[in-house]
């Protein structure tokens, strides 16, 4: 009886722990390389940068290249305990003698990174926890929704109550959901889906858009006005050293 009760308590405790909100501070970083320098950036990340990030308390979440990469871009997501930890980690990283040596050697034949874009994010409770795709050779889709003023809560409610499970119905795997941290204006919804391929993604989206259940949910949620103003989508292929495959 004692063993049984202990087991029940463990299960309950695990369930409560699993439902705790993810309070980490996330950063989506996009590096745009000079022509011909993307391979050098990938090599530097794979051989050195990711390890030095971890050394300074930064968690490597995932690394990808766009499937259509006309801007020589590399996308990655880092996680930190909080904003203050992020600042300390980057300051320590920038001052690290090992990093300085790595950077100097890798740029002996020229600069690598032309521009950097950062998006700071909080985890959204749309999805209880960030997942890893179940299959191999996945294609990821990074989607960013800009809502009409004051309509982000409506979008989040629709995702929680309907969209999430309708994506799964059409074989789109929910991986991670975030809301952006903006200096001004409304946050954006940023999320990652996994597909078997871009072709399968196209089939899934076509089926999703004509699904009567989705149409009914969308129309009901928009009775008092449209929700989404703009949608941006980028297909990404994970790099070999990415934790998210």
Residue ranges and their predicted role:
Residues 1-22:
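Bacterial Sec-dependent N-terminal signal peptides
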Residues 18-216, 220-245:
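Short S/T/G/P-rich N-terminal loop/turn motif that feeds into the first structured element of a domain
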